[in-house]
Regions:
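Structural signature of beta-strand start/N-cap positions in the alpha/beta core
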Residues: 28, 43, 77-79
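N-terminal beta1-alpha1 ligand-phosphate binding loop
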Residues: 5-26, 198
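Short, surface-exposed beta-strand/loop micro-motifs that present aromatic residues
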Residues: 179-186
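Cysteine-nucleophile active-site neighborhood
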Residues: 50-126
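Short acidic low-complexity segments
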Residues: 29-40
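Beta-strand-turn-beta hairpins that frame and shape the catalytic cleft
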Residues: 151, 186-190
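Acyltransferase
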Residues: 2, 190-214
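Pocket-forming structural segment of enzyme catalytic cores
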Residues: 93-175
């Protein structure tokens, strides 16, 4: 059976809710941990929830870390969701220092426990936030966010955030009590989303359709 997108099964992640969202958008989807199946797919999704170290362990124990890196090098579209986005970068400070996949230079750092005013706020960051254009980005044309309007809201659940080494990797930000957080990142054919498109209503479905259109 030909497929439109493969979802990586590495023992962690909201695989089936992601699958349902892609199928709702008309995609033929396969969930697999078979390297041959994953590498032959036209698009690849790396989902994930939970701790960074557990996610990387799930990938490396199955040797799927190599698969993700090889796929990224193939120029075919790759999407990391939530923990999947975080694992795309170089390192994480979550419960120690851990190596990531290193596909997009950057690190995962804790969300500051205070607002910019110094007042404490709730961690994890849970809820809806509007997507914001980074200062040096004129628009989302030519990306999977094309067609969205700044302020369109997406759903996030996280205590850690990606800090790209270069701000040009930022595709969208969100604001949490004055703290600017990377909501989406991009390096060529590789995208990462800190939010959950499968839980983000019509906005999320439009992003999924954008990914399927690449």
């Amino acid at each position: 059976m030909s497929v439109d997108v493969a979802i990586i099964d590495y023992g962690i992640g909201n695989l089936f809710s992601v699958r349902r969202s892609f199928e709702y958008c008309g995609a033929r989807v396969i969930i697999s941990d078979d390297p041959k199946v994953l590498l032959s797919a036209p698009r690849l999704v790396l989902p994930g929830v939970g701790a960074f170290a557990d996610g990387m362990r799930g990938l490396t124990e199955r040797e799927l870390d190599k698969v993700v890196i090889e796929f990224a090098d193939s120029a075919k579209p790759l999407l990391g969701i939530c923990l999947g986005m975080q694992m795309l970068v170089s390192t994480s400070e979550e419960f120690g220092d851990h190596d990531g996949l290193g596909i997009i230079p950057g690190r995962v750092i804790p969300i500051p426990k205070t607002m910019v005013t110094g007042k404490s706020h709730k961690i994890p960051h849970i809820g809806w936030s509007g997507l914001l254009l980074p200062d040096d980005l004129p628009g989302w044309q030519g990306s999977i966010l094309e067609g969205l309007i700044p302020g369109d809201a997406v759903y996030l659940v996280h205590s850690f955030a990606v800090q790209p080494d270069d701000d040009t990797y930022r595709l969208a930000n969100c604001d949490y009590n004055g703290r600017v957080i990377s909501a989406a990142i991009r390096k060529g054919n590789v995208y990462g989303m800190q939010f959950h498109p499968e839980k983000s209503g019509l906005v999320g479905l439009n992003i999924i359709r954008g990914f399927l259109g690449t």
